[in-house]
Amino acid sequence: MAVKIRLKRLGEKKNPFYRIIVADSRSPRNGRFIDEIGTYDPNYDPCKLNIDAEAAKKWLSNGAQPTEVVGKLFKMAGIEK
């Protein structure tokens, strides 16, 4: 089972809000997930970003692969792989 850390889109049309989730790579974007580790709201300047650093580090050490966007968000939050 390949585990990814990725974004789940919520919110309204043209007003997105995202949750950072840990999910099987084969599950749909807004489908089943294993764990929720944070939120990301790009509608503010600067953007609102909340990440549970302990949970993120735990999943990264267990082999979960972040997507490109989530990797950039981790860098913004100061979380290393």
Curated annotation (Swiss-Prot):
Keyword Ribonucleoprotein: yes
Gene3D superfamilies, A to Z: 3.30.1320.10
Recorded GO MF terms: structural constituent of ribosome
Keywords: Ribonucleoprotein, Ribosomal protein
GO cellular component term of the entry, any: small ribosomal subunit
An individual GO BP term: translation
Top-level taxon in the UniProt lineage: Bacteria
Pfam assignment, any one: Ribosomal_S16
Similarity annotation: Belongs to the bacterial ribosomal protein bS16 family.
Protein name (database record): Small ribosomal subunit protein bS16
Organism: Lachnospira eligens (strain ATCC 27750 / DSM 3376 / VPI C15-48 / C15-B4)
Gene that encodes it: rpsP
